[in-house]
Regions:
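Extracellular beta-strand ligand-recognition surfaces/modules
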Residues: 622-646
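Conserved Lys-Pro-Asp/Glu-containing loop-to-beta segment of HAD-superfamily phosphomonoesterases
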Residues: 96-123
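A metal-dependent, Asp-based hydrolase signature
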Residues: 1-28
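A generic "structured core" feature
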Residues: 17-18, 34-40, 68, 77-78, ...
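Long, low-complexity, Lys/Arg-enriched
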Residues: 108, 112, 116, 127, ...
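Exposed low-complexity, polar/acidic, P/S/T/G-rich flexible segments that act as propeptides
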Residues: 643-661, 694-721
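Substrate-recognition element of Asp-dependent hydrolases with the DxDx(T/V) motif
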Residues: 22-75, 85-90, 225
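Extended hydrophobic/aromatic segments used for targeting, binding, or gating
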Residues: 68-102, 257-260, 387-396
Length: 723
């Protein structure tokens, strides 16, 4: 089929055109092809080598461009290119999968066994050539993994960056294919860095450079610093690409907030974000242990309190003057470190702080520190991702900007990305422990609880990212590509690339990255799991899909945990985060009533009414609330009446002080399968079939630790519905 035949079906009137515009449309598309097409230098070299060796060389293409236009396109890519034959499928009414190879052999009078064909389509080029006795060579445009990534990235681009043309990336994916082709055979971790992380961080480096240029001007001396630990990879890429002086500044939220305190409030704010904390950790953080604080911890089991409880009690436990004095000492040590680490610190007028993101807490704390010490250096944030509404309270002389800002993706999407960003942090992080203090300009670090194999994996991924950064510019020049020329285009595609990894991972990426642990490093040395698919399953059973999508950490990689459950659940999570999951479709609706048997410890029994709900995915949910004073020992669920045959996804338990607290509790416990008892029901793995109309699932009730317990049952019905 020729291009003219295709455009004959174009809806001309819809766009205010007539059939007379057909040729104009054809030429417009051909002009775009000429502008966007690039020659593959490796393939061109092989082509010319074969030509110089005296072989007959030419082209066979499945295309709607006729041989005349195909010739123009080839010579536009490489002026002076010559060939011995040129076949376009539209000229012959057949493609490589059917008769085009036969036409070529017949017209050229060539023995198929002496012919050699190179192509990038396994069906048309490879199988088509073999069918005619021609020796084929497969030359894929991209690996199967990279091609799959590109498909997912395009889907996410269209979902998350609505309104922008998904086909125009200024050569970003072409560049990734070319760089990847030159680094085949490396480890999976290296390839992840090369094809995913490297392109994102290289584009971010261009953004950081532009931020520095924006700050420059007469009378200004701009210095660039990367915030440790998450800015470690960005700093390495900076050194690889530019060699210009920049600082790697080891400072974190905890140190900066304490050092910025001139009242109790910054410490209260910090502790309020800590999940759990004990007395030794508190002493490490603030360097003092007043008797009242020690007594406070002594009142908790194992001496461990929540950060929220400590923050609420702290004003009555410590003299504010002690905190102010503590902060002043830390400021002195921090400034000594900054002067030693940042070239020309005292002559600097503007300090650009580069980091993954997100709300500029360290930048704001440094502003307070500089103000307290009379330092007039302006501070400018350059963040990979930004929570832009958090920057409204910046000092007037300071600024902050995110590469992936709310102008690139919506705040809904941004918060979904940041909810899953712990994976990126672990990959980009340095191998050192987090800073806890300074001494004589040197860094004093926490212990690093991450295992050696995790550090080695991160190092291999970083090596791949550095390899991309080191070769991308040269390859881009060779092929006349400029993927980072327009910041908003680069930012959108980097958002899609990053979202694909964080939000829609492949199975092999889950296997590679799933064992990673997150170094919480805020009041604890504990490592939090990145993945926990059973957690997600239990949340869906007990609380529903929307509640599972908004679950607090851990697990740190919630999207990956959904992916571990199933790819479809993973995509539902992404739709929810993009605000594209209608609750009236996917949430629960009443299916009907059912009578549940409740058996007391004293032998008494009663039937209680309960409601069966149906989810948007066709699963059935039953929730049974119990109070402690009911003294229930066993629950009998009439599965024969709910669904005579089905898949039991699980039984879960939540507890709380009242029904609302229990229902909203994220502390969901799965009841072990071996504890469940089936009466009149055949059971095989997760599948069951009721043998009688009275078939029941018996759930032994665990000892209650709070006033209310809610047992939830999740079933996918199979076969005929109950009468």
């Amino acid at each position: 089929m020729r291009i003219e035949q295709i455009y004959s079906c174009f809806p001309f009137k819809l766009f205010g055109l007539s059939q007379a515009s057909l040729n104009d449309l054809v030429e417009a598309e051909f002009g775009a092809e000429v502008e966007l097409c690039r020659v593959n230098q490796d393939m061109l070299g092989q082509y010319l080598d074969m030509k110089r060796a005296g072989h007959r060389v030419g082209f066979i293409s499945d295309t709607y461009w006729d041989s005349g236009r195909l010739a123009r396109l080839l010579r536009a890519c490489h002026p002076g290119l010559a060939w011995d034959f040129l076949y376009a499928s539209c000229d012959h009414g057949s493609g490589k999968s059917d008769g085009l190879f036969a036409t070529y052999l017949s017209e050229q009078g060539i023995d198929a066994g002496a012919s050699f064909h190179v192509g990038d389509n396994e069906k048309a080029d490879i199988k088509g050539a073999k069918r005619h006795g021609i020796h084929p060579r497969y030359y894929p445009q991209a690996s199967a993994q990279l091609a799959s990534n590109f498909q997912r990235e395009t889907a996410l681009f269209e979902l998350l960056c609505g309104g922008a043309p998904a086909r125009l990336d200024h050569g970003a994916r072409t560049l990734r294919r070319l760089v990847a082709a030159r680094s085949a055979g490396r480890s999976q971790a290296f390839q992840l860095g090369l094809t995913v992380l490297g392109p994102v961080m290289t584009a971010f480096d261009v953004f950081v450079t532009r931020r520095c240029e924006e700050m420059a001007g007469p009378g200004r001396k701009v210095v660039l610093g990367f915030l440790g630990r998450d800015g470690f990879l960005s700093h390495r890429i900076r050194q690889e690409l530019h060699g210009a002086p920049s600082a790697y500044i080891e400072i974190n939220r905890r140190v900066s907030l304490i050092a910025s305190a001139d009242t109790m409030q910054p410490l209260v704010d910090l502790l309020g974000k800590v999940l759990k904390i004990d007395a030794p950790t508190f002493r490490d953080m603030v360097k003092i242990m007043p008797a009242k604080v020690a007594a406070f911890f002594g009142g908790f089991p194992d001496g461990i309190a929540s950060g929220e409880e400590l923050a609420e009690a702290l004003p009555g436990l410590i003299d504010p003057a002690e905190i102010v004095a503590l902060a002043a000492g830390l400021r002195v040590r921090l400034l000594a470190y900054l002067r030693r680490t940042i070239p020309g610190f005292d002559d600097c007028t503007d300090l650009v702080l580069a980091d993954l993101g997100y709300s500029g807490s360290v930048q704001k704390a440094l502003r307070r520190i500089f103000d307290l010490e009379g330092i007039e250096i302006r501070l400018h944030g350059a963040y990979l991702m930004s929570l832009d509404d958090a920057f409204d309270d910046l000092a007037e002389q300071d600024s902050a900007a995110g590469f992936i800002s709310d102008l690139v993706v919506t705040p809904h999407v941004k918060r979904m990305l940041i909810r899953n960003v712990a994976l990126l942090e672990q990959i980009c992080c340095s191998a050192d422990g987090s800073v806890r203090d300074y001494d004589g300009g040197a860094v004093l670090r926490e212990i690093n609880p991450r295992p050696p194999e995790q550090l080695a994996l991160a190092a291999e991924i970083q090596a791949g990212a550095l390899a991309f950064a080191g070769s991308a510019d040269g390859v881009a020049r060779d092929y006349d590509l400029d993927p980072y020329a327009t910041t908003d285009v680069a930012a959108r595609w980097c958002a899609a690339t990053l979202a694909r990894l964080l939000l829609l991972p492949e199975d092999d990426e889950l296997a590679l990255l799933g064992p990673l642990k997150h170094d919480v490093n805020l009041g604890t040395h504990a490592l939090a799991p990145l993945l926990d698919a059973p957690f997600v399953r239990n949340q869906i059973t007990a609380r529903g899909l929307s509640a599972a999508c908004t679950a607090a950490a851990p697990p740190m990689w919630l999207a990956g945990s959904f992916a571990g459950l199933s790819p479809s659940y993973n995509y539902l999570y992404v739709l929810f985060g993009a605000n594209r999951l209608p609750a009236d479709v996917f949430e629960e609706r009443v299916s009907g009533p059912v009578q549940v048997g409740l058996f007391r410890a004293d032998g008494g029994a009663a039937l209680e009414a309960a409601t069966v709900y149906r989810t948007g995915l066709g699963e059935l949910r039953l929730r049974i609330p119990l109070s402690r004073r009911m003294s229930i020992s066993t629950i009998a669920v009439p599965v024969a009446k709910i669904a005579p045959e089905g898949l039991l996804h699980g039984v879960t338990l939540q507890q709380g002080g009242d029904v609302r607290d229990a229902a909203e509790s994220q502390d969901v416990v799965a009841i072990a399968t071996e504890r469940l008892i089936y009466g009149g029901v055949q059971w095989n793995g997760g599948h069951y079939r009721a043998e009688t109309e009275d078939g029941c699932l018996l759930i032994p009730v665990a000892p209650m630790t709070q006033e209310i317990a809610i047992y939830s049952v999740a079933i996918t019905p199979l076969g005929a519905a109950p009468k």
